[in-house]
């Protein structure tokens, strides 16, 4: 057995010994007729932050706080401790003359991680730290397991994700990330509400998985005896609301895609989609750059943020470039000069590109998109709108009047990663049905991410939908950029994980 294995075994034994000691304390309390979980409600007068912020008016006054005991340095007849609540920590001071010998002994028996209420007077130590001089206390919830930050379990990088509750307790920067996430979504709503958008809710379960090119999760509705899908996008329902007369709508919600997991993808993720009648994709660019800049300013205090040691400037206007021009800039190939699918396929021969279908089935649009992914994306570091995507890969977008081979669609990129996707929405029901039929052919060729036919959506378009601009932003990715987080797992409280056992 190696020294490392011996150390791990010793740590495991010590950890288990601590668990046994805590359980014994719990049993001892029960034997004394005390229940450490009997408290149902706590009346606290202040939080740690309120006491620190209002020290001058609270000095020498009695307060009651509650929280988790996170450090304890009590020896002999006096000592200090730290208690943590949602807002931070505050130091505690206890002295035998104030509480008596038996009560001090009881306090010393508390473990790190226990929840307690503390009553005492506010003062400052000689070093200037705002503290509470304890006059009374009560155990309100016993921690039966020690926090694992000093034990081998935390060396497993997955433990932070599997046991996020522990991660949040011991890592202040993790708590800060998720507080920022909350604020990002708050200011997203604030921005749109101020522009007279209304927030709505659309179905998570649907008989058709539409609105995006993705593989869905399938489930079965027993009462109706039909297969249903977890939504992959909110788009088609939101556009039905535009048809119904809701001229500005948005939804922030979960989407589900039955695909791979990596640092940028989680099967369950958060999107915001918004739609505005009488607007186009230029309006959506303006909304995107202004909203993201507004959120960055509110959350980070600046539109310039650091991401992986690179400064990203979100201040409008963002760079705009067409897809064709971007491919020409970074690959040297001008797709305006490519006239046929055959010519486009020749460009791929001899290159180690990953194709979603057989090369002979690829079109010029497929090859253009392939070149963009291979040569361009990684170079789009500063916020950039890539505009005018081919019709064939944009089945819900309206054609450009001056160049019908392409659509009024853009994707926003930051640090080489897609942040958002937007269109001038296709509102011609006849053309939309033709596009859906073409997508069905793509499915027959093996593209299981191609769109499904949605007859009810076609019916809605036949009722009539005004010219409309639509936008979708990946909330998780935006949070990553604004918190300098390098994995999507770092911004989702409980990311999808492979089970460690059956």
Curated annotation (Swiss-Prot):
Q: Name one GO molecular function term.
A: lysine-tRNA ligase activity
List the GO terms this entry assigns under cellular component, sorted alphabetically: cytosol
Disulphide connectivity of cysteines: none
Give a yes or no for keyword Phosphoprotein in this entry.
Answer: no
Q: Which cofactor does it need?
A: Mg(2+)
Predominant location category? cytoplasm
Annotated protein name in UniProt: Lysine--tRNA ligase
Q: Which organism is it from?
A: Clostridium tetani (strain Massachusetts / E88)
Top-level taxonomy: Bacteria, Bacillati, Bacillota, Clostridia, Eubacteriales
Gene name, Swiss-Prot/TrEMBL: lysS
């Amino acid at each position: 057995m190696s020294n490392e294995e011996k150390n791990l075994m010793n740590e495991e034994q010590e950890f288990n010994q601590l668990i046994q000691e805590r359980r014994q304390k719990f049993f001892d309390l029960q034997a004394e007729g005390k229940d450490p979980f009997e408290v149902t409600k706590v009346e606290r007068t202040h939080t740690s932050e309120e006491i620190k912020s209002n020290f001058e008016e609270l000095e020498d006054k009695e307060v009651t706080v509650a929280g988790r005991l996170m450090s304890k340095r009590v020896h002999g007849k006096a000592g200090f401790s730290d208690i943590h609540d949602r807002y931070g920590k505050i130091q505690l001071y206890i002295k035998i003359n104030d509480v008596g010998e038996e009560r001090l002994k009881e306090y010393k028996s508390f473990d790190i991680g226990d929840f307690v209420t503390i009553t005492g007077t506010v003062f400052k130590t000689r070093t200037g730290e705002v503290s509470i001089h304890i006059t009374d206390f009560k155990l309100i919830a016993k921690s039966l397991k020690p926090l694992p930050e000093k034990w081998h379990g935390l060396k497993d990088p997955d433990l932070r994700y599997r046991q996020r509750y522990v991660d949040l307790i011991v890592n202040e920067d993790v708590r800060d990330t998720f507080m920022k996430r909350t604020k990002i979504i708050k200011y997203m709503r604030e921005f749109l509400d101020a522009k007279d958008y209304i927030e709505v809710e659309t179905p998570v379960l649907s008989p058709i998985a539409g609105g995006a090119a993705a593989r869905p999760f399938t489930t079965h509705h027993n009462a109706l005896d039909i297969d249903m899908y977890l939504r992959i996008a909110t788009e088609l329902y939101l556009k039905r609301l535009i048809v119904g007369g809701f001229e500005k709508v948005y939804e922030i919600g979960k989407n589900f895609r039955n695909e791979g997991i990596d640092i940028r993808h989680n099967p369950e993720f958060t999107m915001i989609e918004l739609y505005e009648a009488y607007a186009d994709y230029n309006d959506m660019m303006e909304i995107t750059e202004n909203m993201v800049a507004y959120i960055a300013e509110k959350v980070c205090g600046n539109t310039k943020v650091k991401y992986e040691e690179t400064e990203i400037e979100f201040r409008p206007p963002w760079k705009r470039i067409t897809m064709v021009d971007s491919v020409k800039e970074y690959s040297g190939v001008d797709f305006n000069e490519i006239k046929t699918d055959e010519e486009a396929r020749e460009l791929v021969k001899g290159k180690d590109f990953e194709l979603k279908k057989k090369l002979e089935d690829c079109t010029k649009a497929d090859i253009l998109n392939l070149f963009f992914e291979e040569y361009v994306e990684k170079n789009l570091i500063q916020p950039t709108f890539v505009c005018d995507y081919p019709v064939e890969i944009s089945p819900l977008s309206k054609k450009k009047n001056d160049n019908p081979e392409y659509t009024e669609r853009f994707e926003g990129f930051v640090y080489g990663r897609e942040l958002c996707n937007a269109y001038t929405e296709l509102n011609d029901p006849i053309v939309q049905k033709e596009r859906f039929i073409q997508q069905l052919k793509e499915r027959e060729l093996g593209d299981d991410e191609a769109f499904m036919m949605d007859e009810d959506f076609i019916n809605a378009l036949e009722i009539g939908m005004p010219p409309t601009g639509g936008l979708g932003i990946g909330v998780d990715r935006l949070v990553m950029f604004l918190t300098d987080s390098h994995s999507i797992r770092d911004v989702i409280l409980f990311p999808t994980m492979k089970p460690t056992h059956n």
